[in-house]
Amino acid sequence: MTESIVNVSRQFFAEILLPILRRDFPAETAETAFGVFGYGSEVMGMDDAYSSDHHWGIRINAVMPDVLYQDRGRTMAQAVLPHMPESYHGYDVRAGFSGGTGLSITGLESYLKTTIGIDHAPASYADWLGAPEEDIIHIVNGELWLDETGRFTHVRQVLQGYYPEPVRLRRIAHWCRYFSGMGSYALKRAILRDNEYYATIVFSRAVRWAVQLAFMLERQYYPYDKWTYAFFRRLPRLYAPLAPLVDEAVRLATPWERKLELLNRMADVIDHFLVADGIIRPHPQFAEHPSSGYRLLEHAYAEILHDLPEDLRGLVPVWEQVHWEANHSQFVAGLELEAWDGMLNLRAGE
């Protein structure tokens, strides 16, 4: 693709949409934040030739206070429609991202709640741990072009500052526990029992957790799975030592015993950085057990927990997109089935 849809959308907003909004809705515009943010590969800067087959086109995302949205949001979105050109820079505006205007407005508090589970910037351990990391990305990504009140800017800035250190450590501990206990240990048991079904599940999850741990050690949010590896390649410290292990491990031709060995070496790399960063203390080299395998990172899990505040130890991070899925289910339930099939590019065969 020769031109990013984000760049085109920014120009469209400045040249076409913003003058209309300032003229017809000056008070509402002053209360609204505009940009491109949220969901979609283009917001991550990862759009390519495949991205344009669904939910594609000029897009301006906007968030305003919920009360204002309920009163004026839908009116604004519909009122700009007659003033929109059919196309802009070769893009069909009326077939774009938001279905006819290029402008997608929602309530700020509702948007936050359906993305990270709270309607404000995180202010407590529970707030931080209740927000799925891959959905924090959908608040901080993209671009914000106008936010005169600074409400959304404030939320973005708090999240862009990354986790408070105790929260980061609690998350690292949780991932160490799962990589080791539900990953490498589980794979060892699956191999011993010749259970390839279970081996496939636990191996895939373990590789995912190892790469996500690399992001935590670098103090960077990981994105959703489709783009995790692309951003993994940008990590300044962990990519170089982990990538050869990950790349060999995920090859289908790599035997199960070798996959387990590679998981164990990933654990060594992560453990090295945990010690180097002062997260855990230096320790002796542990031996691999013939039936339990190499539960190295569960040593780190326990040590980190011991040093955490008591009120944080029992808080479990939310890592699935539970808040967004609740919203998505309501969205899909409100569509005609034919419309949903069209969005999925499902058409009757010949």
Ranges and model annotations:
Residues 312-350:
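Extended, compositionally biased alpha-helical segments that mediate assembly or anchoring
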Residues 1-6, 59, 188, 193-195:
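Glycine- and acidic
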Residues 64-69, 193-197:
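A generic structural motif
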Residues 21-61, 65-67:
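Active-site nucleotide-donor binding segment shared across nucleotidyl transfer reactions
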Residues 70-192, 244:
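Conserved NTP/Mg2+-binding pocket subregion across the NTase superfamily
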Residues 15-30, 91, 153-166, 210:
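Membrane-interacting alpha-helical segments
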Residues 137-314, 323-325, 329:
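Conserved nucleotidyltransferase catalytic core and NTase-mimicking acidic/glycine-rich helix/loop elements
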Residues 1-19:
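N-terminal regions immediately upstream of nucleotidyltransferase
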